[in-house]
Amino acid sequence: MRYAFYISDGTALTAEAFGHALLSMFPVNFEHKTLPFIDNQEKANEVCKTIKKAVSDSGEPPLIFHTFVNEKLKAKITDCGGICYDFLDHFIAPVEKELGVKAEPKTHRTHGVHKNYNFRIDAINYALDNDDGKRLNQLDKADLILIGVSRTGKTPTSLYLAMQYGIKVANYPLTDDDDFERLQLPKELKQYRHKLFGLTLSSQRLHEIRSQRREGSQYASMAQCRFELAEVERLYSREAVPFINSTHYSVEEIAAKILAKTNLERHRY
C-alpha cells in the first residue's frame, strides 16, 4: 500500500486537512502518517529514515504534504525520496502580490492560543455540561440547541461544533413518553424556539445504531424507530423547527449544513 505523510514543524493540521481533502478525490488506498512538531534537525533525520523505509516497503515513493516554516528542515524532508507538495509555497507568492505585503511565516500561529481558542474551550465545557438535557437552567447561554430522538448524532455534532468553531451547543432528547403524542415542544424549550435545530435520519440507520447498543430491545426495534422518527418529523414541521436528515452525512458535513442554515458566528481563527 502506498504511503501518505503529513509533516510540519507545527501541528501538521493544515497539511493533514489539505492532504486528506485532496486524496479523498482519488479511488486509491493509502497508509496515512501524520508527523507534527518536526522542529529540529534530529527529528527531521528520523523522519527521513521513516520516509525511506516507506519507499522500501511499498516500492513506490510516498506522497508528502508538508507545511514548514524552517527552510532547512523543509529542504531535508524534500530530499528523502518522496513526492512533496508544499501548500504554503504554492499560495504565498500570489497572495503577497495581491496584498502588497511580504509574508512573515511563524510556527504555531495558525493553531496557537488566542482569543478564539478560549471561545472553543468554553464551548467544549458548555457542550459537556449541557449534553442530553442535563442543565435546563443554562439554555439561555446556548448559541444552538440540537433536538432529536435518541442516537441521532446530537452529542457528537454538539462537540464538533464546539471544538471546531467555538459554538455553545446544548442538546435535548425527545422521547416518545413525554413529547411525541402531544406533538408540541417540551415546555422547557418553547422560549428558546429560535435556537432550536432538529436532527433526524432513516429508520433503518437508527435501527442499526440502536441495535449496537441494545440489540433485540423494543427501543431498537424497527417499528419503534419508524414511530419515533415519523412523530418527531411531524413535530419539526408543525413547530417550524429547521432540521436535516443526517443518514448519509459525516459529523463534519452535518455541522457544515447546520452552520449554512443558521448563519451562526464561527470562532475558529
From Swiss-Prot:
The keyword DNA-binding does not apply. Keywords: Kinase, Nucleotide-binding, Serine/threonine-protein kinase, Transferase. It comes from the Bacteria. It catalyses: [pyruvate, water dikinase] + ADP = [pyruvate, water dikinase]-phosphate + AMP + H(+); [pyruvate, water dikinase]-phosphate + phosphate + H(+) = [pyruvate, water dikinase] + diphosphate. It holds the Pfam family Kinase-PPPase. It is an enzyme of class 2 (transferase). ADP binds at G148, V149, S150, R151, T152, G153, K154, T155. Belongs to the pyruvate, phosphate/water dikinase regulatory protein family. PSRP subfamily. PANTHER family: PYRUVATE, PHOSPHATE DIKINASE REGULATORY PROTEIN 1, CHLOROPLASTIC (PTHR31756:SF3). Bifunctional serine/threonine kinase and phosphorylase involved in the regulation of the phosphoenolpyruvate synthase (PEPS) by catalyzing its phosphorylation/dephosphorylation. This is Putative phosphoenolpyruvate synthase regulatory protein. It comes from Idiomarina loihiensis (strain ATCC BAA-735 / DSM 15497 / L2-TR).
